[in-house]
UniProtKB/Swiss-Prot annotation:
Described purpose of this protein according to its UniProt entry: May act as a carbohydrate transporter. Required, together with ENODL11, ENODL12, ENODL13, ENODL14 and ENODL15, for male-female communication and pollen tube reception and burst at the synergid cell surface of the female gametophyte.
Family: Belongs to the early nodulin-like (ENODL) family.
Name this protein carries in UniProt: Early nodulin-like protein 12
Protein's UniProt keywords contain Nucleus: no
Gene: ENODL12
Major localization listed first in the record, in broad terms: membrane
């Protein structure tokens, strides 16, 4: 009987770890692929279409891969984003492999530092979701992927899809398996 409490405690801790696994920070490549940070091929194929179809969470990292000889990434205010003003960036990155921590909820505005590229559409707005403090709802642990072009420029991000439900189901099955194992071991030791 003395071993049941430590075993059940271990099972509880493992269950807590599995159920919180979806909240781990992700490293997300801008546009979903190398070479996406460029002037878009068409007005219907912008990085904002990609961003609108993905969810970003506090703690995630966003990564740009680009040729540092011809481009850079500028984090700017909303006003500078809308006017493509490169003169006063909040932050400037020009290393060709830029990694930015999304450390607060709300919008982030990024534009190209290459002359004229922002006006041609090389810019992106990322909206980072607020952290949920209570146990309500679940979050998707899936990394964003390239999505089909959105028919309108201002569509909301989609709800988590079947993959999120699948991840939750797998986590529940793993936790249930650990719990049953602990019960069997506990009964065998009694």
């Amino acid at each position: 009987m003395g071993i049941i409490v430590p075993v059940l405690t271990l099972v509880f801790l493992l269950f807590a770890k599995v159920s919180h696994g979806a909240s781990n920070p992700r490293v997300i490549l801008v546009g979903g692929s190398v070479g996406s940070w460029k002037v878009p091929d068409s007005p219907n194929n912008t990085l904002n279409h990609w961003a609108e179809n993905n969810r970003f969470k506090v703690g995630d990292f966003i990564v740009w891969k680009y040729d540092m000889k011809v481009d850079s990434v500028l984090q700017v205010t909303k006003e500078d984003y809308e006017s493509c003003n490169t003169a006063n960036p909040l932050k400037q990155y020009n290393d060709g492999n830029t990694k930015v921590a999304l450390d607060k909820s709300g919008p982030y505005f990024f534009i190209s530092g290459a002359p004229g590229n922002c006006a041609k559409g090389e810019k992106i707005t990322l909206v980072v979701l607020a952290e949920r403090k209570s146990g309500g709802g679940s979050s998707s642990g899936d990394a964003p992927k390239v999505s089909p072009v959105s028919p309108t420029a201002q569509t909301p991000a989609p709800a988590p899809g079947p993959a999120a439900a699948h991840n939750a189901a797998v986590g529940l099955k793993v936790a249930s398996g650990w719990f049953l194992t602990a019960v069997v071991v506990g009964l065998a030791m009694a």
